[in-house]
C-alpha cells in the first residue's frame, strides 16, 4: 500500500510541476477529450465528464482491459459517435483472439453498447461538467457492465482537468466499483499526461495526439500508453490507438461557406451577370450541359415554369435542387422572360423523378441571386410538395422537352457483405460480393431493375462445411423487376407497384404506398407483397413456403434535429409477426440508426433483437453526367450489426424481422430516402444555396 501511495504522489507531483513550467509558455492550450481503454471518453480505466463532439465518428483499438480479476491481455475495437449534443454512443468488440471457435476454446468474445450523457444544466459554466453513463448496456452476457456519474473541472491557471465520480460495476477486479478520480494535464498540443485512481488502484498514462489541422478533413489521431499501474501489469502492455473525424462540414449549414474563396466569388459574379442578356435557349442549354434531363420551360399566370430532373447529384436531391436554382436565377432575367411572354423574373422550378413531379420551388431571380451571393436575405422562396401533378397540368409549355432521359440507364455498383460480428466462430466472418444494378427508365414512372451479384471473397466459416455456408453469396441474377410509380388523385397518395424476381428465387409482386403531410413531418406507409419460390422443394426435399408481407409504417421527422422515428408493424418476410421501432440520426447524408424489434412465429416465443445500421454514400457528390449509360456508386450503402436481447443466451439467429429491402424502393427513388416535405427543404435552405457554390467550385477545379 505504501508503494502505491508513493507512486501516486510521484505521478501527481510530476503532473503539477510540469504544468507550472509549460503553462507559462502555452497558456492557450485546452485539454483534449480522448478515448480510454474502456468504452467511454476518459483517462485510462475511468471516465471524465467530457463527451465526443456532436457529429464526430471515432475508432480506437485498445490492448489491456480490466476483465474478471485482473487487467487481461485482451483487445477491443470500439466505434463511437457523437449522436446528439451531449450524448456519445459506443459499440465495442472485446476479444482474446480473432478466429478461434468459442465453443471449443472457451475464449471471450463480447459485443456491447455504451452511452454517456453530459447533463445540460451546467452549460453556462464552461469549466465544470457533469455526466452520467452506462457501459455494456443490455445484452445477455455482461462482462463489463458499469453505471457511473462523473464530474470534472478545467482550471484556468494551467491546462489541467480534474475528474471525480462514483460507479457501480460488475467487473470482479473492482474497477469503477466505488469512488474514482483522476487528473489530465496537457502541457503541449501534442502530449497529454494522465493519472487516476480507478476505485481499486492507481494508474498513469502518456497520450500523444496530433495537433489541430495537421491531418486532412479535420481528422485527429492519438496514441496512449500506460506507464504505471497498481494492478501488477509490469509484464503487460496497456495501450490504445484512436482516430476521429467529423461527419458534418460547413457545407450543409454555414452561411459563410466559400466566402473567403476569391476565385469562386469572381466566378459567381460572372455567372450571375449573365441573367441580364441570357435567353431561354441559353438557360435550357446551361441546364442540359450540367446533366439535367427532361428539361422543359413554360408559363403559368405570367410566371416562368422550369421542369427538370436530377440524376447527377445523388447524395441528396436538395443538392440537385440547389444547383438548378442557381443556374435558373443566373439566366432568367428580363430578356429571357420576354422571350416567352413572362411578366417578370418570377419563376417556379419543378423537380422531377422519372418524369414525376416531387417538389416545386417558387422564387424570383433578383431575390435568389442576393441569397446566393450573400448580399441580402431572400424571403421569397417557397417550397411545395402537395398537388404537384395538378400544378403541372396548368402549365402552358413553350419549349419541347430537352435531353429526354427515356430509355437511359444507370449502372450502380455497390459492395455487399453478409457477416457475423463477434460471434463464437470469430470476430468477423464474411462473404463479400459486388453488385451491379441496371436501372433503365421507361415511360413516366416506369423502370426496369436488374441486379447481378458477383462473389469476391469469404472467410472459412462461409465456405463449404462452415457454420455460415448457406449464407454465402453466389454468382447470379438476384433481382429482376419492373416498377411503376403513380399517385392517387385527390388524396395525394404515392404508390409503386413492382413485379418480378427477388432474392434470387422468388417471383411475385410488391406494392408500396405512402402519404406525406404537407410539412413532411409525418408520413404513413403500407407495404403488401406476395412471392412464390421457383422450386417447389429445397435441396433437402422440404417444401419451399410462399412469402408474403403486410407491413404498416409511421415515420415522424424533425429536420431541425436531423432525426426521424419509425414504427413498423405487421407480417415480415419469413412469416413472423410483430413490430420494429427505429430511431435515425442524419449526419449530412450519413444515416445512423438503431432498431429494436420484437416478433414471433406461430409456434414459437417472442424474440427480441437490436440492430445498429449505418447508411452512407459510396459515390461522388457530383456523379458523371447522365447519358445513355451512367455509371455511379451506391448513394445509401447499408452496413448493419444485429444482436439478440431479452434472452438468457445470445445464440445466433437469422431471418426474424426480415424485410424486402430494395435499392430502388419508392422512398429512395422519389422521396430522397425519406428526407422530404416542406419543412425539410425549409430547414435545408442553406445547403440548397451552398450546393450551387460547391458546383461552381467543382467547375473551377
List each language-model region with its residue ranges:
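Gram-negative bacterial Sec-dependent N-terminal signal peptides
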Residues: 1-23, 583
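Flexible, glycine-rich linker and terminal segments associated
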Residues: 25-35, 41-42, 49, 190, ...
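Transmembrane beta-barrel domains of Gram-negative outer membranes and organellar outer membranes
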Residues: 24-142, 154-158, 206-208, 228-238, ...
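Gram-negative outer-membrane beta-barrel proteins
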Residues: 65-69, 97-101, 121-123, 138-140, ...
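Short, aliphatic-rich beta-strand segments
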Residues: 57-61, 302-310
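Feature captures outer-membrane beta-barrel proteins of Gram-negative bacteria and organelles
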Residues: 50, 74-86, 108-124, 130-132, ...
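Transmembrane beta-strand segments that form the barrel wall of outer-membrane beta-barrel proteins
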Residues: 56-66, 87-97, 127-138, 151, ...
Amino acid at each position: 500500500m505504501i508503494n502505491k501511495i508513493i507512486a501516486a504522489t510521484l505521478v501527481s507531483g510530476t503532473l503539477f510541476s510540469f504544468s507550472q513550467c509549460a503553462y507559462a509558455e502555452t497558456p492557450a492550450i485546452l485539454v483534449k477529450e480522448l478515448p480510454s481503454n474502456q468504452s467511454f471518453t476518459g483517462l485510462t480505466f475511468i471516465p471524465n465528464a467530457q463527451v465526443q463532439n456532436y457529429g464526430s465518428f471515432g475508432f480506437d483499438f485498445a490492448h489491456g482491459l480490466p476483465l474478471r480479476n485482473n487487467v487481461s491481455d485482451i483487445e477491443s475495437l470500439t466505434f463511437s459517435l457523437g449522436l446528439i449534443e451531449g450524448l456519445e454512443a459506443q459499440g465495442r468488440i472485446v476479444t482474446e483472439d480473432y478466429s478461434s471457435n468459442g465453443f471449443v476454446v472457451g475464449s471471450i468474445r463480447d459485443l456491447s453498447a455504451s452511452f454517456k450523457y453530459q447533463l445540460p444544466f451546467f452549460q453556462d459554466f464552461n469549466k465544470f461538467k457533469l455526466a452520467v453513463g452506462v457501459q455494456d448496456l443490455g445484452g445477455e452476457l455482461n462482462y463489463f457492465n458499469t453505471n457511473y456519474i462523473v464530474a470534472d473541472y478545467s482550471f484556468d491557471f494551467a491546462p489541467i482537468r480534474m475528474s471525480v465520480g462514483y460507479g457501480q460495476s460488475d467487473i470482479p477486479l473492482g474497477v469503477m466499483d466505488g469512488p474514482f478520480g483522476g487528473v489530465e494535464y496537457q502541457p503541449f498540443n501534442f502530449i497529454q499526461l494522465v493519472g487516476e485512481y480507478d476505485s481499486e488502484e492507481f494508474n498513469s498514462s502518456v497520450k500523444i495526439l496530433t495537433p489541430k489541422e495537421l491531418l486532412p478533413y479535420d481528422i485527429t489521431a492519438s496514441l496512449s500508453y500506460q506507464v504505471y499501474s497498481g494492478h501488477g501489469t509490469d509484464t503487460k502492455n496497456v495501450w490504445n490507438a484512436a482516430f476521429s473525424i467529423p461527419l458534418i462540414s460547413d457545407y450543409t449549414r454555414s452561411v459563410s461557406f466559400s466566402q473567403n474563396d476569391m476565385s469562386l466569388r469572381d466566378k459567381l459574379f460572372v455567372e450571375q451577370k449573365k441573367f441580364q442578356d441570357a435567353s431561354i435557349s441559353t438557360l435550357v442549354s446551361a441546364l442540359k450541359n450540367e446533366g439535367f434531363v427532361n428539361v422543359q420551360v413554360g408559363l403559368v399566370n405570367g410566371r416562368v415554369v422550369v421542369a427538370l430532373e436530377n440524376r447527377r447529384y445523388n447524395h441528396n436531391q436538395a443538392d440537385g435542387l440547389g444547383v438548378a436554382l442557381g443556374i435558373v436565377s443566373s439566366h432568367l432575367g428580363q430578356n429571357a422572360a420576354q422571350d416567352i411572354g413572362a411578366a417578370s423574373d418570377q419563376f417556379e422550378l419543378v423537380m422531377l423523378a422519372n418524369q414525376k413531379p416531387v417538389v416545386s420551388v417558387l422564387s424570383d431571380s433578383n431575390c435568389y441571386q442576393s441569397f446566393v451571393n450573400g448580399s441580402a436575405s431572400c424571403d421569397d422562396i417557397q417550397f411545395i410538395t402537395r398537388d404537384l401533378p395538378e400544378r403541372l397540368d396548368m402549365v402552358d409549355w413553350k419549349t419541347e422537352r430537352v435531353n429526354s432521359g427515356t430509355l437511359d440507364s444507370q449502372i450502380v455498383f455497390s459492395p455487399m457483405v453478409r457477416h457475423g460480428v463477434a460471434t463464437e466462430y470469430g470476430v468477423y466472418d464474411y462473404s463479400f460480393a459486388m453488385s451491379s444494378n441496371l436501372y433503365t427508365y421507361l415511360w413516366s414512372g416506369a423502370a426496369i431493375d436488374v441486379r447481378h451479384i458477383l462473389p469476391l471473397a469469404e472467410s472459412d466459416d462461409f465456405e463449404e462445411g462452415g457454420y455460415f455456408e448457406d449464407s454465402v453469396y453466389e454468382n447470379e441474377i438476384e433481382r429482376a423487376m419492373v416498377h411503376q410509380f403513380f399517385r392517387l388523385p385527390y388524396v395525394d397518395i404515392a404508390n409503386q407497384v413492382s413485379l418480378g424476381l427477388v432474392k434470387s428465387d422468388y417471383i411475385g409482386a410488391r406494392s408500396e404506398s405512402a402519404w406525406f403531410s404537407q410539412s413532411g413531418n409525418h408520413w404513413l406507409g403500407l407495404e403488401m407483397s406476395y412471392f412464390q419460390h421457383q422450386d417447389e422443394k429445397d435441396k433437402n426435399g422440404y417444401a419451399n413456403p410462399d412469402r408474403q408481407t403486410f407491413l404498416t409504417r409511421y415515420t415522424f421527422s424533425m429536420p431541425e434535429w436531423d432525426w426521424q422515428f419509425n414504427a413498423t408493424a405487421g407480417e415480415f418476410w419469413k412469416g413472423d409477426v410483430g413490430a420494429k421501432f427505429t430511431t435515425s440520426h442524419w449526419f449530412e447524408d450519413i444515416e445512423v440508426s438503431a432498431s429494436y424489434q420484437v416478433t414471433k412465429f406461430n409456434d414459437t416465443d417472442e424474440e427480441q433483437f437490436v440492430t445498429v445500421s449505418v447508411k452512407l454514400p459510396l459515390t461522388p457528390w457530383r456523379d458523371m453526367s447522365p447519358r445513355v449509360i451512367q455509371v455511379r456508386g451506391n448513394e445509401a450503402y447499408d452496413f448493419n450489426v444485429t444482436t439478440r436481447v431479452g434472452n438468457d443466451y445470445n445464440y445466433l439467429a437469422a431471418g426474424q424481422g426480415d424485410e424486402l429491402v430494395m435499392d430502388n424502393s419508392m422512398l429512395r427513388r422519389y422521396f430522397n430516402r425519406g428526407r422530404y416535405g416542406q419543412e425539410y427543404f425549409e430547414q435545408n435552405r442553406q445547403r440548397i444555396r451552398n450546393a450551387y457554390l460547391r458546383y461552381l467550385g467543382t467547375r473551377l477545379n
